[in-house]
UniProtKB/Swiss-Prot annotation:
One GO term (biological process): DNA-templated transcription
Protein name: DNA-directed RNA polymerase subunit beta
Reactions the enzyme catalyzes: RNA(n) + a ribonucleoside 5'-triphosphate = RNA(n+1) + diphosphate
EC number(s) given by UniProt: 2.7.7.6
Pfam families per record: RNA_pol_Rpb2_1, RNA_pol_Rpb2_2, RNA_pol_Rpb2_3, RNA_pol_Rpb2_45, RNA_pol_Rpb2_6, RNA_pol_Rpb2_7
Complex and partners: The RNAP catalytic core consists of 2 alpha, 1 beta, 1 beta' and 1 omega subunit. When a sigma factor is associated with the core the holoenzyme is formed, which can initiate transcription.
GO CC field: DNA-directed RNA polymerase complex
Source organism superkingdom: Bacteria
PROSITE patterns given in the database record: RNA_POL_BETA
């Protein structure tokens, strides 16, 4: 606004540079652009990825009898029918129509029938990286799953290695050693067979061929060898069969061990030399030879037939069938797909040892070479050969990200495969002459999978919109659960734990507490996802000990081989690393290295942590557990009525608010020409075009908080009527009608204004003289920000473009009369009175008028049997007026529903026949304000078929009522700082009774000092002290994570502000005026109000619903339930011998149906009597025992058998009056 000066900001960061931060919601937007390729100008030249790949993999489709073929040309995207805001208002999906150009070619005639076929509506991502599905904003969370490829693992308990080939789609192949020392293969975790059978089926038929494939050999002389030489070959194995030339008999099979008997036989046969296997490291390793003995075949044909009979038991085995089966399992693109990632992982695994076969390979199916190389690798692992290591399954090189685009295309593949089946069926059924692509294609399976994925998939989530940070974090979340991921129950400690490869890729701090810990994670602030779906983090390159300006992004795999210096390494003016030995990171270790041995250096200290953790000042002084709570609780902060940026921040606040896209950002350079509460108009440079930005006012978010945008740019208005006398870059002068001169300065702080009027122009009071100069946003092709645009309007929880989740309040750390015992908080009445922590909450109530069998429901003011008071705020149509104050039970929308004739009693029917009173054939089904809600009606939206609004089937009219309510801070509300220091308001104290400082300033909030030492979150102490200096000096501080203010910096600013270095002050008791015994630590701390408001939780039941089976009251506020009296409470009452109280609680106050009816009557009639009956849960128990075939007999006190069911029925049938024994008050 004009005339408003911004607070000066002091940044303590020495190395943190936020300019290198990627666009924080890039992961969502890039992935969806990859999928849709909407920006490609020529639709026929889209890349083979995402949606295009789905079409290309489904088509062409040939008819079963080969007489026609259906081909795909390209797809066309239409325009969305409604804007995102309209979709939210009408509960519609923000989607664009998808059409595809399909050709049907009749083979016999060569005729081509081409049509543009509508393939359904595809939900589209909004500017903010969200989807609007049925009017609700949703986010598709990225999934962290095990990457396709080949993995070698080591089982410590059994001391064996195993290999696993995991494809993107298709059969799993595993190799491992069984208990008998045989190398076995498993397909799809089911069929086990010797691994050599698979190798032989690939064309290496004999034992000798298999051995030569994996081992080298050496010839050793036998004829003429000395006994010493012959001793050396004892225990070695032959690589080939040794055959008696005369008889043709195999004397020694390939792989046989040579012993003394064999040597004498060989001498007898006059064998001159034998070829022996050279095992790695000379250790005999028989696992392959054991498998060769077990497989029992010695040529290719036998091997492949045996393989087929194992895989397809009971089917006739022919060479052709067997080859087809093997191809189907691993070598056919239709049934087996490694994906680009799987192939990339296999290549990178084997390239080092076999570059000829594996560098630059592109095949997405397995090749025989892949299987053979896998077997070779596992044999080398068993032989402990150098450069052969098992993989770490939790390493981020073996886990990848599936983002939105990939998740949607996987779903569409399922839909399209169903479509393919339908097309083939229809091709055979319909006549060729009449067939067209439109008639053959059914889009139902496609729309079904899209709706199912967006509506009910575990990864498509209702967006957390509590505040901008919650929204941003939700889009950057990584989820290891979901289809194809882990399950909560089976995930062990190792998967959940922090791994060294997470550094700079996934935040080690931000994860939920509870069963999902370590399974739901957040991306680190600088991390990005590469084309293969692996997380990368940026590093500055170091060459010959000198830090270059180059930045390289490394995946976890690539980082393995390098030594990386930390960002805080000391660098001189030339960019060279100063110290002789530098602390580096290498895999999970921290060795010291010379500068010449270092290849990379961290970019910034905060690259380790996520955005919300990077918002915690002095994070380095907090314990990790509390930092985790602090990160999570910032996401629960409610946007307040008056936002205030923190006095002590980290510098990340501006970027978090900007990238959350909750503010309005200017798109083109220009000048603001007009500003009001709903629109901002910016005239572009050159003055030919102007852009109008519409502000969102008081809309409900998913969590019921208030979304409201406020302009922060301005124009200069004339304050007088007169004439512009002078215009320059610095100022505008206006001479008034009475000759007075008014000056308007055009540079205020960082804001520059540009004149819109010229000298000599007549101006009226309120005329626009100048507009603020604004910068347009510029992005690169990756979506990263090159130039930040000017923020035109703040969103919720944003103050002047800076994220502002809470308020700065004057706090003291001292115990006060026990009101802050155990994390409770004592606050001043001023905070409530001045609306410091007040927030606006909006609730939406909806009613639909439907067409019923008995006639339509009607929204009307004419409701039977109600007093005039109930209608006082309804308009003539029966809808409440905007501005009305509503309380529980008030009518929001009047509606009547036709009543069925069956409902009428005989007396009513008689009245009808006499008076013909048909008007009362309706019952009241109005929308009323539910219990526990009150507020002011701020908006009403009406939709009806008459106005051509789209409504669900059977709905004639729909009304939505929005009720807003200002919530002040109450006792019981949860509040928290940014360091995991949470508590509940215990008392709101009169301002004059609060402790006050020597100058008479009363405190706003009193916290318990005992909450600090055991929790080790000292960040709050530093923040409080620096906050006081900021308040006194009128500036704001930025102290970046791990690169912030040191103690000396804090001390220097305290001196400047004339504050004591220990920040301790003499305080006086507000009630007595006497000073407290000790000085107290005081300062300004940033406190948030969390979304756990006491009003939403407090609840009391009068009369409510009962469970159908047990007849006990339901539980929970939503069901208007009762308070559970559990077994421990029963024990407590038993311990006190309170038998009557206990009996009453277990029977008439709970599930004794007869007793409930009686007690009601007794209360109405004023009779002081209670006679408990049998609780319904006892009947349920009896029936359950009878269900177990146990005959249960119940007897009364006199030994007579009581039939419970009769006992009840008698009561309900006769409805006889119950006699009450009146107890006289003697």
């Amino acid at each position: 606004m004009y005339g408003q000066v911004e607070r000066k900001r002091v940044n303590f960061g020495k190395i943190t540079n936020l300019d290198y931060l990627p666009n924080l919601i890039q992961i969502q937007k890039r992935s969806f652009d990859w999928f849709l390729q909407a920006d490609v100008k020529d639709e026929t030249k889209r890349r083979h990825q995402g949606l295009e790949a789905v079409f290309r993999e489904t088509f062409p489709i040939e008819s079963p009898n080969n007489d026609m073929i259906m081909e795909y040309s390209h797809y066309i995207l239409g325009e969305p029918k409604r804007s995102p805001q309209e979709c939210k208002d009408t509960d519609a999906t923000f989607a664009m129509p998808l059409k595809a150009v399909i050709r049907l070619i009749i083979k016999e005639t060569g005729e081509i029938r081409e049509q543009t076929v509508y393939m359904g509506d595809l939900p589209v991502m909004t500017e903010q990286g969200t989807f609007i599905i049925n009017g609700a904003e949703r986010v598709v969370v990225s999934q962290l799953h095990r990457s396709p490829g080949i993995f070698f693992s080591y089982d410590m308990e059994r001391d064996v290695f195993s290999a696993r080939v995991i494809p993107y789609r298709g059969s799993w192949l595993e190799f491992e050693m069984d208990n008998k020392g045989i190398l076995i293969a498993k397909i799809d975790r089911k069929k086990k067979f010797p691994a050599t059978l698979l190798v032989k089926s690939l064309g290496h038929g004999t034992n000798e061929e298999v051995l030569r494939l994996f081992y080298s050999s050496k010839k050793e002389k036998i004829a003429g060898a000395t006994s010493k030489d012959l001793k050396k070959i004892l225990g070695r194995r032959t690589i080939n069969d040794i055959i008696n030339m005369e008889t043709g008999e195999v004397m020694l099979e390939a792989g046989s061990k040579i012993n003394e008997d064999n040597i004498s036989i060989l001498k007898e046969m006059k064998v001159k030399e034998v070829e022996l296997i050279e095992f790695p490291k000379g250790k005999d390793n028989p696992i392959l030879i054991n498998a060769l003995e077990k497989d029992g075949v010695n040529d290719y044909e036998d091997a492949i037939l045996k393989f087929h009979s194992l895989m397809r038991q009971g089917e006739p085995s022919t060479i052709e069938n067997a080859t087809t089966e093997l191809t189907r399992l691993f070598f056919s693109p239709k049934t087996f797909d490694l994906g680009e990632v799987g192939r990339y992982k296999i290549n990178s695994k084997f390239e080092f040892n076999n570059p000829k076969e594996f560098s630059g390979e592109k095949a997405r199916v397995l090749r025989p070479a892949d299987i053979i190389e896998t077997v070779r690798y596992i044999l080398n692992l068993f032989s402990e050969t150098e450069n052969y290591y098992p993989d770490d399954i939790d390493h981020l090189g073996n886990r990848r990200i599936r983002s939105v685009g990939e998740l949607i295309s996987n779903q569409l593949k399922t839909g399209f495969s169903r479509v393919e089946r339908v097309i083939k069926e229809r091709m055979t059924v319909q006549e060729i002459e009449t067939q067209t692509p439109q008639l053959l294609i059914s889009i139902k399976p496609i729309t079904a999978v899209i709706n199912e994925f967006f509506g009910s998939s575990q990864l498509s989530q209702f967006m957390d919109q509590t505040n901008p940070l919650a929204e941003l974090t939700h889009k950057r979340r990584l989820n290891a659960l979901g289809p194809g991921g882990l399950s909560r129950d089976r995930a062990g400690m190792e998967v959940r734990d922090v791994h060294y490869s997470h550094y700079g890729r996934m935040c080690p701090i931000e994860t939920p507490e509870g069963p999902n810990i370590g399974l739901i994670l957040s991306m680190s602030s600088y991390a990005r996802v590469n084309d293969y779906g692996f997380l990368e983090t940026p590093y500055r390159t170091v060459k010959n000990g000198k830090v270059t300006g180059q930045i390289e992004h490394l995946t976890a795999d690539k980082e393995e081989y390098h030594y990386i210096a930390q960002a805080s390494g000391v660098i001189d003016e030339k960019g060279e690393l100063k110290n002789k030995l530098i602390s580096t990171r290498h895999r999970g270790d921290f060795p010291f290295r010379n500068p010449s041995e270092i290849q990379y250096m961290d970019l910034a200290p905060l690259q380790v942590v996520s955005v919300s953790t990077a918002l915690i000042p002095f994070l380095e002084h907090d314990d990790a557990n509390r930092a985790l709570m602090g990160s999570n609780m910032q996401r629960q902060a409610v946007p307040l009525l008056r936002e205030e940026a923190p006095f002590v921040g980290t510098g990340m606040e501006t970027r978090a608010a900007y990238d959350s896209r909750i503010c309005i950002v200017n798109k083109h350079d220009g000048v603001v020409t007009s500003v009001d509460a709903e629109n901002i108009v910016v005239e572009r440079k050159g003055g030919k075009e102007s852009d109008t930005y519409q502000l969102t006012k008081f809309k409900k978010t998913n969590q019921g908080t208030c979304f409201n945008q406020k302009p922060i740019v301005g124009v200069v208005h004339s304050e007088i009527n007169g004439k512009v006398s002078k215009v320059s870059k610095e100022k505008i002068e206006v001479t008034g009608e009475n000759g007075e001169l008014k000056e308007y300065v055009l540079q205020i702080g960082s804001k520059q204004y540009s004149p819109i009027v010229s000298a000599g122009e007549e101006v009226k009071r309120g005329s626009t003289l100048a507009g603020q100069v604004v910068v347009g946003e510029k992005l690169d092709e990756m979506g990263n920000i090159l130039v930040k645009g000017t923020v035109l309007a703040d969103g919720p929880a944003v103050d002047n473009g800076v994220l502002a989740l809470g308020r700065n309040v004057l706090a003291a750390f001292m115990p006060w009369e026990g009101y802050n015992f155990e994390d409770a908080i004592l606050i001043s009445e001023r905070i409530v009175r001045d609306d410091v922590f007040s927030s606006i909450h909006i609730e939406e109530f909806e009613i639909q008028a439907r067409e019923t069998k008995l006639g339509p429901e009607q929204i009307t003011r004419d409701i039977p049997n109600l007093s005039d008071k109930a209608f006082r705020d309804l308009d003539e149509t029966g809808v409440i007026r905007i501005g009305a104050e509503v309380k529980p039970g008030d009518i929001l929308v009047g509606m009547v529903t036709p009543k069925g004739e069956t409902d009428l009693t005989p007396e009513y029917k008689l009245l009808h026949s006499i008076f013909g009173e048909k008007a009362k054939d309706v019952r009241d089904s109005s929308l009323r304000m539910p219990n526990g809600f009150e507020g002011t009606v701020i908006d009403i939206k009406r939709f009806s078929r008459e106005n051509q609004d789209e409504l669900p089937a059977g709905v004639e009219e729909m009304v939505k009522v929005f009720v807003a309510r200002k919530r002040k801070l109450l006792v019981g509300d949860k509040m928290a700082g940014r360091h995991g220091n949470k508590g509940v308001v215990a008392r709101v104290m009169a301002e004059e009774d609060m402790p006050y400082m020597e100058d008479g300033t009363p405190l706003d909030i009193v916290l318990n000092p005992l909450g600090v030492p055991s929790r080790m979150n000292l960040g709050q102490i530093f923040e409080t002290q620096l906050g006081f200096a900021a308040s006194k000096l009128g500036i704001s501080f930025e102290t970046p994570v791990f690169d912030g203010a040191e103690e000396s910096d804090v001390d220097n600013f305290c001196k400047e502000a004339n504050l004591p270095l220990n920040s301790k002050f003499k305080l006086y008791d507000g009630r007595t005026g006497l000073p407290f015994m000790n000085e107290v630590f005081c300062g300004y701390i940033y406190i948030l109000k969390l979304a756990h408001l006491v009003e939403d939780k407090i609840h009391a039941r009068s009369t409510g619903p009962y469970s159908l089976v047990t007849q006990q009251p339901l539980g929970g506020k939503a069901q208007f339930g009762g308070q559970r009296l559990g077994e421990m409470e029963v024990w407590a009452l038993e311990a006190y011998g309170a038998s009557h109280t206990l009996q009453e609680l277990l029977t008439i106050k709970s599930d004794d149906m007869l007793g409930r009816a009686r007690i009601y009557e007794a209360i109405v009639k004023g009779i002081h009597s209670i006679k408990p009956g049998i609780p319904e849960s006892f009947n349920v128990l009896v029936q359950e025992l009878r269900g177990l075939a146990l005959d249960i007999i119940i007897t009364d006190s006199e030994g007579n058998t009581v039939d419970i069911s009769d006992y009840e029925d008698e009561y309900s049938k006769s409805k006889k009056k119950i006699k009450f024994e009146t107890i006289e008050n003697a």
